[in-house]
Amino acid sequence: MRGLVRLGLTGGIGSGKSTVAGLLAELGAAVVDADAIARHLTAPNGPAIASIAATFGPDFITSTGAMDREKMRALAYADITARQRLEAIIHPLVRQETQRQTLLAANQGHPCIVFDVPLLVESTTWREKLDWVLVVDCTPATQISRVMARNALTRDEVEKIIASQASRRHRLNAADAVIFNDSLSLGALALEVDEVARHFGLSCQPLSPNQK
């Protein structure tokens, strides 16, 4: 396959999607990480902070000038209209930065761009922009145990997050390829990623030291 390849990458929380993105980056892909962009937007004095404060009030901004993630998470999962108001602030800014990073990666000559998007399947606009969709999958039990250990959330909190995302079946139905990452070692996962890259004909090559 010649030319720039646009690969959508998604998976439920705790699936290992970000690890897969990192492995693809090591092969030379440019990664556009929607979560990382959103975190930047809501970091201290980030581009979204003023609108969040105006919409939700100063109680949702920490003393450092960042969005209070814990408080906002609780509100968003309890009140769908609040979540929609937050998304109306965040999503246009994420799209703008995504477009900037995509253009930059293309101009730099990357063979493929990986769009790491947690809510890719839920979106009505992403699929038409992509050549392929790769889903990183694992069982719900594995999701829960990983996220509880990583984020210090309760089981109930993790289950609410999982319930707010696309169903496992929905994600799998949208996939052009699937990596089942339930109990893979990092080495085994890397081999799976290499196989997927070959399957799609991605011309990714490991980065040389001066490119990293």
Curated annotation (Swiss-Prot):
Gene3D superfamilies: P-loop containing nucleotide triphosphate hydrolases. InterPro entries: Depp_CoAkinase (IPR001977), P-loop_NTPase (IPR027417). Residues 6-211 form the DPCK domain. SUPFAM superfamilies: P-loop containing nucleoside triphosphate hydrolases (SSF52540). Belongs to the CoaE family. Catalyzes the phosphorylation of the 3'-hydroxyl group of dephosphocoenzyme A to form coenzyme A. ATP binds at G14, S15, G16, K17, S18, T19. GO terms for cellular component: cytoplasm. GO terms for molecular function: ATP binding; dephospho-CoA kinase activity. This is Dephospho-CoA kinase. Its EC number is 2.7.1.24. GO terms for biological process: coenzyme A biosynthetic process. It comes from the Bacteria. It is found in: Cytoplasm. It catalyses: 3'-dephospho-CoA + ATP = ADP + CoA + H(+).
